[in-house]
Structures are given as structure tokens and as C-alpha cells.
Amino acid sequence: MKKTTLLVILDGWGYSDSDYFNAIKNANTPTWDSIWQEFPKTLINASSLEVGLPRSQMGNSEVGHVNIGCGRVVYQELTKIDKAIEEKTFGDNKAICAAIDNVIKNDSNLHLIGLLSPGGVHSHEEHIFEMIKIAKQKGIKRLYLHAFLDGRDTPPRSAEKSIKKADKLLQDLNLGYIASVCGRYYAMDRDNRWDRVEKAYNAIVNANADFIYDSALEALEQSYARDQSDEFVIPTCIKKDGHLVKVQDNDSVIFMNFRADRAREISHAFTDESFDHFPRKKHLNINFTTLTEYDSKLKCAVAFPPKQPINTLGEVLMKNHKTQLRIAETEKYPHVTFFFNGGREEQFEGEDRILIPSPKVATYDLQPEMSAPEVTDKLVAAINSGKYDCIVCNYANSDMVGHTGNYEAAMQAIEYLDKCIARLKDAILEHDGNMFITADHGNADMMVNPETQKPHTAHTTNLVPFIYVGHKKAQVALEHGKLSDIAPTLLNVMGIAQPKEMTGKTIFNFEK
């Protein structure tokens, strides 16, 4: 019977001493409080340069899981693209040039789709603005921007500033206009809610939408009048001079998001010949280009293809003939699999995966426990089975409920997680295993912005906890650690040599 080493990632569980709308600190968490007092712990960095992001940029789930799983600081797409723009090589990118050449050759249209936001989590609006400028420089005559609106990694009603910037740039360059707007709730689903994606797709491709207005700003104002914040703006088309824009054969579409998980579904709708999740009028003959690789199965050009890291935690465990399990509910399943493995889709030998469906609710404040009960049941059963050397799991609650801005619901989510942690603690200690508890970034630790007194729905840059729960004697060996130090710590407790590619350091020393 194997002694399991369990890594619990509490998504969005940051640490803050402030009790100002801090759902984590103010919730009733007897198990967490006792673990915090009784077991070795420290705080580690999950944002900024320490996870390969620009200075002061908040971390996110993709970045967090990549850094944890790879055991080294992995420089993120945001940083790479910023560097290409700074060095003026962005416009020389082969995939981008091919998309633009296709438009010029066919005298067709260039469509940019993506999250128009300064959030820096899934995209950055500066990348969109740079692409618009490059298109003008290279001779594009007609460019249409299909803007997905944020309100999740940014304040809920903050899109006006971004829309005005885009409008002004397009007008100054006499290049085109914003042809549709849509909340990310529709265009960037990742939970197989294809009815949402269908509405976004039809607005972009077929100019078929519930609402049509004369400008993107008017569309936003009318959405607010219906009490729909940025994230939930119903897909809307913009009519200019009596003209509605459609995507047609021989057009080029460039998807400007750099993060994969919420870009996959709508990309498949654009590119899959045998797509069957909702009816399309036809399969378009277009040049479809993505800024980064969203899914290796997508038939499209990729501007910044990934470099597969070697000797990630999963690969090292496989090479040492260890069994491993990855488990999460739908919202975070790609993070403990694809992202944790450094962008690898395939399972390693000896790696099992369990996907628990996320509840089908409009927003997760309606069901703060999400699918944590089912995740915990499977985890406890896996620990009791003695089958696995290493288990990696993710609890989505503190992030997904935190994103709703509902403080009371976030506290309920935290309190439910506390009960789940109690069950895991009992199972691990009973079987003489090791449990590490951490987070990939903060969120529920600040539910209201103290400066604006408005709901704070974005991630925080706060440090995150790293706790060891087990019978071994452990001492903190590394102050000011970071997410990339977690994998070396797990290898240390399991008695496995750390490969040279892992540049992280062990956070705890354990008595032999």
C-alpha cells in the first residue's frame, strides 16, 4: 500500500492580514485555523516576476499551475509578446504576416477577435492595439474588431475606457470599426455551455444577434441599462452606415487571446470541419490564426507556438515509476492536467485523471460549494485505496465564487472548503501520507476594493499559503519562496532526486 503525497491547490486562496471583505479570513474555518497553528507553514509568491509575468502583474490559474508543475519560473506568453512588441519583431511574425498577406491577396477583410481588456490574464488590449497599427502599416484596408468584454479580471463596469481607446485608434487610422461586442461569459466559455458560444459565434460570423446598435459605446450603455455588466453583455452587432459585418470565405481571423483554456471552444467552432455542438451555416474557408496554441488538435496557424518543458513533475514521477492522479472539476480540470504538465495534452504512463462536472448554474455564487463534495469523495477514496504515490487536486471554489463579487457566497465557499480539508487531513494522517496545501493566486482574500468600495472580482497579488500536513518533522528551509519551489519540495519528501531542469528549491527540509 502506497503512502500518498497529496498536493491540494485552493484556487484563488490568497493570504491577507486585512479583514476588510476578506472572505477567507472572516469565514468560519476551524480546520484551517488549527492546521495553520499546528503544522509547518510559510507564504510564497504567486504573481509578478516570480512566476514569469511582468512586474506587479497578478497571477492566474494557468500561470500558477504551469509554474507549480514545471518546478521552474516559466516565462509567460504575456511577457514573450510584450518583448516582441518592444523589440519591434511582432509585425515580422510568420503567422501574423501570413494572415495579413491572405487578406491583401484576396482583397478581403481582417477580423480581430479577443478580450479587449487591460487585465493581462487572458489577453492584453495593448496587443490588440499593436496588431491594428501593424495591419495599417502592411496595407490592410478593412479591419473589424470583435470585442469580448471582461469585467472579471477588471472591475465589472470598466469596458468604456477600452472601447473608447479602440474606437479612437481605428478612427484615427481610418481602418475599420468595432463590429460586435460580447461579454466573455458567452465567447469565452470553457465548460461546454455551447448555447453561450453559439450566440457569440453567430454575432461575429453571421451578424445575427439579439441586439444591433450604431456603436460599441451605445451597445455598452444599453447593456448597463439592462443591468448587464461587462462580463455578461449579450452578443451585440454594430451597424455602420447601414452595414453589418460578417466573416466570409477568404477572410483572415486573428484570435488575440494568449491564454488557452477560455479560447478553445469558440476556436473549434471556427475551424472544425465536423463541428457538431451547434449548427453552423457552413464551414468557413478562412485563415484562422491564434496568438498562442490553444489546443494541439486545432487546425490553425499559431503566432507564438509553445516550447515543451522537459522534466516536469509529472514526467519525473513517471521516470521513477510512480503512480499519480490528477483530479478537479470541469472549471479547473485543464489546469491540473494540460497546464500542470507544461502544455502537454497526453497523460504520462502511470497518470490517471478524474474529471468531476461543474454544476450547471449561471454563476457560482448560486452554488458556492460547486462540485467540491464530489471531488473530496473521490480524493478520500483514492487516498484510502493506497494506489497512488502522488495526487494533485484543485478546488475551484475560492476563485470561481470570488469572481462573482458576492462576498457572502465567497465566505460560504470557504467554509465548505474547510470541511473538505478536514476530511483530507484525516485520510492523509490515517495512512501516514503527506499533504501540501497551497494556492495558485489570490482572489477571495479581497472581495471589495477598499478604494472604490465596489466589488473586486479580479485576482489579487497577495502571497499564498504553503502548508505541510503529515507525521514527518519539517522545517522551513526557504524564505521568500515561489510557486516553482513546490515541485522540488514534493520530490524531496518523496525521496526523488530533483532534475537539473527544475531550478526551484525545496521549501521544507524533512527529517530522514
Curated annotation (Swiss-Prot):
Enzyme Commission no: 5.4.2.12
Keywords recorded for this protein, A-Z: Glycolysis, Isomerase, Manganese, Metal-binding
Q: Which cofactors, by name?
A: Mn(2+)
State the reactions this protein catalyses.
Answer: (2R)-2-phosphoglycerate = (2R)-3-phosphoglycerate
- One Gene Ontology term, aspect cellular component: cytosol
**UniProt binding sites for Mn(2+) 1:** 399, 403, 459
Tell me the cofactor note: Binds 2 manganese ions per subunit.
Query: Pfam families recorded for this chain?
Result: iPGM_N, Metalloenzyme
Q: Which is one GO molecular function term here?
A: manganese ion binding
- The positions annotated for binding substrate are 122, 152-153, 184, 190, 259-262, 332
Which residues act catalytically here? 61
Q: EC class of this enzyme?
A: isomerase
Q: Which domain of life is it from?
A: Bacteria
Q: In which pathway does it act?
A: Carbohydrate degradation; glycolysis; pyruvate from D-glyceraldehyde 3-phosphate: step 3/5
Residues annotated as binding Mn(2+) 2: 11, 61, 440-441
Mention one GO biological process in which this protein takes part, according to its record: glycolytic process
**Known partners and oligomeric status:** Monomer.
Q: Which family does it belong to?
A: Belongs to the BPG-independent phosphoglycerate mutase family.
Q: What does this protein do?
A: Catalyzes the interconversion of 2-phosphoglycerate and 3-phosphoglycerate.
**HAMAP family recorded:** GpmI
Protein name as catalogued: 2,3-bisphosphoglycerate-independent phosphoglycerate mutase
Organism of origin is Francisella tularensis subsp. tularensis (strain WY96-3418)
Upper taxonomic lineage: Bacteria, Pseudomonadati, Pseudomonadota, Gammaproteobacteria, Thiotrichales
* Gene giving rise to this polypeptide: gpmI
